């Protein structure tokens, strides 16, 4: 007879693997806590047993998404909802490097000259903040790029991702004022970016430019409004070179990620596009 796993719907095989991984992770986590105690801070996000649970959960949550994408349906509510849910899960495990929890431009900045004994230490908060901008940029842009490779992203996808990640991050830090203000600004920026994305998609950009340009256009307004909201609602400590540079370098990083996507086989990128402009039922 046929093996049981061959009866699974397309895309759900790895979900079954995820169930096993999650179960093993739960047992490992219980043993870890009994022997080493319970984590209380950032170490909880890096605990090996928690990372096993994360891996299993990721495999489970992406089952419906893999199934939809396998059929060429990347813009239905199920596919978009699955993509947003997976992105939220990844963002939770990256909270320690998220701009939405750090609100880095509001943190104290003290510039000390090269050669000063405290020069490196004084710049650590700013460099960590810049890294947070870049990592959060990748977190937002990668799901968009995966969608753009296969279809025109539906309106509202960027706003959904930004709102979900930013407001969940604000909730994790007990609705800290800076986090709430930053989330509101980023969400408004994403709405503005949606208009730019829609306009650019109607310009029929050259294939090699389309995704890099769209990626930059998604990120620059989002971070610009995020920082503008922080400036108005909390106040910035970073000098203009830092906060403006954070926006520019994030836009460049987004475009670079989009450029890497262009190197994918043409059949995988362009063939489904015309067929997927209108969401499938």
Regions found by a protein language model. Name each.
Residues 1-12, 71-78, 203-205, 267-281:
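Membrane-interfacial, low-structure loops and terminal tails that flank and connect transmembrane helices
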Residues 3-17, 27-82:
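Membrane-interface helix-loop-helix junctions at boundaries between adjacent transmembrane segments
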Residues 10-17, 72-87, 148-164, 205-217:
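Cytoplasm-facing juxtamembrane segments at the starts of transmembrane helices
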Residues 18-26, 186-193, 209-230, 248-252:
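Hydrophobic alpha-helical membrane segments
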Residues 22-30, 85-95, 161-173, 216-229:
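Aromatic-anchored segments of alpha-helical transmembrane domains
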Residues 31-48, 97-124, 174-178, 231-243:
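Membrane-interface interhelical loops and short amphipathic "cap" helices
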Residues 51-67, 130-146, 184-197, 245-265:
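Hydrophobic cores of alpha-helical transmembrane segments in multi-pass inner/ER membrane proteins
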Residues 166-195, 236-245:
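Membrane-water interface signatures at transmembrane helix termini and the short loops
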